Amino acid sequence: MHIPLVEPGTVGPCPVAPDALQGIKRQQTNPARWNGEGWNDFVADLRAVGVEVAESAAMRGIFATDAGGTAYGMPHGVVVAHSAAQVSALLKAAQVHRVPVTVRGGGLTTEGESVAYGGVLLDMTGMSRVLAIDAAALTVRCEAGIYWHLLAEELRREGLDYLSAPLNMTSSVGGTLGVGGIDVNSARLGCSADQALALQVVTPTGEIVECSDGEHAELFQRVILGYGQFGVITEVTLRIRPYTPLRMHYYYYSSLRTAIEDLQLLDRNDASDYSGILTIMDCAVNLLVAFDSDAREAAFKANWEQRLRGYGEFGFALCMAGHYALRPWRISEAAYLLRRKQAVFPEFRRPEFHRDGRMEDRTVVFSRAVWKHWGSRNMVIPDLATSAGRFVEAVERGNAVCRKYFRHYTLYCVGIKLRADHAPHYEMSCVPPGAEGWAYGCEFEPMIEGEVYSRDHFQSFKNAIYDIGVDMGASYYRFGGMMKGYIRRVFGDALVDRHLAMKRAADPAMILNRDVIF
């Protein structure tokens, strides 16, 4: 099969995207490997200014894939970032020699966005220091390669905490700000990207720039939620808050629609500090609600708890027992629900992470559970992001796709409070066009459980979910990398071409994260 070479930033003859398999509709492949032209001169230029490039197979192999485990590639070399000046030198040399630069933090992408198909991989984890904590102003300045859990450790020594961050211990701060960052308190506080007050950014041409809403605002708008296209974030100033443990409550539903309606009721009325939905298929739907303070919890119990239509754990168990007693042919499904409950639920109640009935560190608790009970060699997590009004429909349609492709799966739903003043940040991002007040996202995650599925099966599943987004005018949290063929279909040529023109102006050689979006 002949796949024609295309210039980065242009659309090839395939109606979906460059490098799509011609014989399989919307089947995506890894991009073609960069041919290595100019590599030796590029390395020589870097070493002349004191930037070390690791070229051993062992070092390069560490970065052969990402958390998704479905995309594989090898860089020609690896540079571990240690300073903005070093990153600047690298990008300047890359522009001269037209060497692709792939930036990687925690490597938690799932569609190959942080996998290098040749060129240089820039590992940001070498920049992982906390530079300053201002307890009075409630801000922190840190380097962008730091993991959120390391930032939390530093902050909590001062009785402080970040506002919202992904529920994963090995997400990097800079990588998170480039894609959004969703927490179970995002329906109240917004996504992680909205907590950034200022950034130090190295542009694709090597200029080191401090930017914020008031300084170099256009660059700030493009880098935040920019999927790494307009610069490398090297330092970040974030809003923070006093640390408080939280108290969790769980409500159980047998209906996705009812649970989502109750979730949105709480979000609209600011009735909880944390909220989200985690399911076992569509049979056991768990609405999680949590509070930072006794006063907020008491107000919820007085005004809102009685309006929820979910059950307590014991009541839901009785409901399920009656349901399956009348449907004995589904006893294997009931047995799976029971096994899953017995395996997963204790993770959220481990005594070492609780004190006086309060959860001390939600990131540790949720991250442990994710990797222990959802992680596998492949992480296939397509998603849909919609306005509040269309979310129920999106989840129900996505759920039907999950049932078609996999025996067992999990849905994770959460809201994101939007800032009207950050509308320019949200353009061509995971925030769906037209969403006001809140956007909502749902991850559709199959439970692999040791079974072997072909790459085509995974891809067909993802296509079926993403086609729903096209039909509904939605967006996605993961629309880059191997799924970038959907970008034009969702956002339209006019918007994509405008961003592509900005990308070409900012990155003349199209070297920075070239296979992620354009």
Where are the regions a protein language model picked out?
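Glycine-rich N-terminal segment of FAD-binding domains in flavoprotein oxidoreductases
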Residues: 34, 54-133, 140-144, 149-164, ...
